[in-house]
Amino acid sequence: MGEGAGAWIRVPVGAEAGRWDTRGSVRRVLLVVHNVTSATRLLDVLPLLRDWRVQLLATCTGSSPFQAGVPELLAEVGVPVLPWAQALRTRVDLAVSASFGGQLHEVCGRLAVLSHGVGYNKTLATPDAGRRTPDAGRRTPDAGRRTPDAGRRTPDPVFGMSDAWLLVDGEPIADAMVLSHPEQLARLRAACPPAAHTAVLAGDPCFDRMLDARPYRDRFRRALGLRAGQRLVVLNSTWNPASLFGDGGDDLLPSLLPRLTGELPADDYRLTAVLHPNIWHGHGPGQVRAWLERARRGGLALLDPLADWRQALLAADLVIGDHGSVTYYAAALGTPVLLGAAPLDGLDPASPVAEFVRTAPRLDPLRPLRPQLESAISDHRPHRGPAELTTSVPGKSAALLRTLFYDLIGLPEPDAPALLDPLPLPDHTPPRHTTSLRVLTRLLDPHEVELRRYAEPTYEPEEPEELPEGPAGTSRGGRPGDGEPVRAHTAAHEDTADREAVAAADVIFRHSPADDPRLGPPAAWCAEVLARRPQCALAVYVSAPGTCTVRTRTGVTLTLTADASAADPAAHASALFACLSAGTAPRSLIANGLTVRTARARHRVTVTPADPAEDGTGTAW
């Protein structure tokens, strides 16, 4: 794409388009895409141009090194795609871009430029070549060098806020430069006075979509697999070596990820990752998944960079991030933030993002993680800057942008209200721990268990206060549960890659619908696992959000049922294992039920014989 490559299209534009058009008396609006990142902002505003009088077109400048993913994205949008060379020779009524780069000044029509992040905050050198490639992130041979008479490094220009990016031959490239806040206008006037008259304050459509979706936070949490008492931690990284994902600074993430899954109880915390599209499409989705494979087996959900990241921010209890726009959006929503990477190089020191990076709390990788996360949540006070400076017209970007677009096109606006698409409800993505779990339990009475599960800890996790540790295998005396020791067992998903861990597990589990023809009935699968794995004491088939079937080595088969929002049924099964190990008879659990304390919540679990013809009265298991 770009570079003029590709056959020129013949309809609905081209020399003979009039012969082939079905609707030719329309105004042409060209969407100018640089990469997937900039395209996301154009997707935000597409609903404002749904009009019988408008023909949408798209093109890609080819100026960004991040070209992967663009053809697929434009194909999904489903509008005619012009090669860049044809786009520059096609008269349009309006061109809309969300970045600078390529020969934008050669577009044959009026040009509106949006920001593809939270305003303009980063410095970036322009290349020597005749075209601009703002996404390249590389310095030209002379950029940043000391000149003989200067004696000091010349700072790079601020991307989107400097003559180098905004002017050609002293004239503004854009007819309208959309800003979201007067703070940006003040910096623009100071940095590039000739372009100031093109500025239009029209808000932030991306942020407005998030604000509009705030009432649906609980739905988003359920969609992302959050259960009662569980907290969602979002790991967010922009691109470049100084980012949280990058290896140009402390290279924190490779060591942080196993600590997060090993130190945070799996039922107390849900982990998701939101990575910049330039990470995905620069290194390749397959490579990104490979780098994060171990963490994903430990329960990390890796979100598509286009689909659900905003819903994740709305659902989050905490974001661990860096100097990118997504982390700033999280702070603007009032979500607690800890910075895992906080570089100031490359940021405009006068920008709100730079001020946020200077003042936001940091994650200390040398200290235990869980206390830091819990303090960040409990002691959180929203940052005023992000909330106030992201947009000066919250909820109004749709109306303001549509008015601007139609003024530039030269058409009266449609009579219907200007509306952005609501954020969709994500697909249900429950956590999957396809790894071994270290399970710590303490019996509070014969039918009540306190429980914590840790994914692949490299050391015995520090005991939370709720699980005071006593001498292994001993009781501190008193009634059941009074000073009872913390006991440990291993639970493993059947698909755990480490087959030795599966072979040694006390509890083996899997998640699948009860009618999965590949596995057979849940009770039969449980019997098969026990026959194949002599070390296993309990097999667990999780068939629904609140239901599992378990079978003991002596053949007692039970169904555990709880509310769908309660803990993972595999956790309930581990609690049952603890009760049975302590001598509680299955018939007593059937009569009294099971109570599981985990994730700051108390879950009631009903225990019934899996086969109504059996009463579960056996005491051995």
Predicted feature locations:
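Catalytic donor nucleotide-activated moiety binding site of glycosyltransferases and closely related
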Residues: 60-71, 145, 258-304
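Catalytic binding pocket for nucleotide-activated donors in carbohydrate/polymer assembly enzymes
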Residues: 325-389
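Donor nucleotide-activated moiety binding/catalytic core segment of transferases
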Residues: 82-86, 286-319
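Conserved catalytic-core segment of nucleotide-activated headgroup transferases in glycan assembly
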Residues: 40-45, 206-288, 393-399
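Extended catalytic core of nucleotide-activated donor transferases of GT-like folds
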Residues: 66-131, 149-165
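N-terminal pre-catalytic "stem/leader" segment of glycosyltransferase-like enzymes
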Residues: 1-83, 467, 473-597, 618-621
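A donor-sugar binding/catalytic signature common to diverse glycosyltransferases
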Residues: 100-102, 107-113, 304-349
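A nucleotide-sugar donor-handling region in carbohydrate enzymes
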Residues: 2-13, 160-245
